[in-house]
Amino acid sequence: MAHVAKKFKAASAKVDRVKRYKLDEAMSLVKQTATKKFDETVDAAINLGVDPKHADQVVRGAVVLPHGMGKAVKIAVFAKGDKAREAQEAGADIVGAEDLAEKVQGGFMDFDKVLATPDMMGVVGRLGKVLGPRGLMPNPKVGTVSADIARAVKEQKAGKVEFRVEKAGIVHVPFGKASFEPEKLKANFSAIMEIIYKAKPQTAKGVYVKNVTLSTTMGPGIKLDLSELAAAHG
């Protein structure tokens, strides 16, 4: 543990806790603060001026990252007939209907994402207690329930990420790996922020994006210069 603490302290020493960093500098710095032997995920914590207790201020959405997430995603699809075939041809790892639902009810969870065609939601809905707590329940608002199931599969395989504001008004979303080049991290992050700004609720008052902090899985937080973000996306 002392060795781990020493590494974290060394990484933290590279970050000025008071400074708000420009994007280019932040993306280079986030790579420097990754100290683990595994390829750490890079996350953004985006503090929004919304009150999620009000339904009209719940910010959620999804975006296909231009450079993906740097990992293979195992996808389960609930579909029948031609739609099942389309899902398989698009690269889905597991495709089924009632048979797949029975497996999931029995404890089968060997997948990262769950997609469904609209006609299958009656079956999938019964899995709410299993899929819901794991954040796997398909939802049309983020494109995981879709009639164009082939496109939905391809987007997930390409690195689609979903986000939803939490109780404290914060959105946590991953946007790459520490091994990515800074330019790729920047492009992925910018794609997320574009959607975040577009998702601003009409009822939100005051400052919308209040704070943004980047970090690797085990690294220190790096605060961003909000004026640069507002100029690019606001």
From Swiss-Prot:
Give the transmembrane region(s). Answer: none
What are the entry keywords?
Repressor, Ribonucleoprotein, Ribosomal protein, RNA-binding, rRNA-binding, Translation regulation, tRNA-binding
For the biological process aspect of GO, one term held by this record is: translation
Q: Which InterPro entries does this chain map to?
A: Ribosom_uL1_bac-type, Ribosomal_uL1, Ribosomal_uL1-like, Ribosomal_uL1/biogenesis, Ribosomal_uL1_3-a/b-sand, Ribosomal_uL1_CS
**PROSITE patterns this protein is in?**
RIBOSOMAL_L1
One Pfam family hit: Ribosomal_L1
User: What does UniProt give as the signal peptide span?
Assistant: none
What cellular component GO annotations does this protein have? Answer: cytosolic large ribosomal subunit
Coiled-coil annotation reads none
Q: What are the recorded GO MF terms, alphabetically?
A: rRNA binding; structural constituent of ribosome; tRNA binding
Q: Which CDD domains match?
A: Ribosomal_L1
Q: What role is this protein assigned?
A: Binds directly to 23S rRNA. The L1 stalk is quite mobile in the ribosome, and is involved in E site tRNA release.
Q: How does it assemble?
A: Part of the 50S ribosomal subunit.
Q: Which family does it belong to?
A: Belongs to the universal ribosomal protein uL1 family.
Write down what this protein is called.
Large ribosomal subunit protein uL1
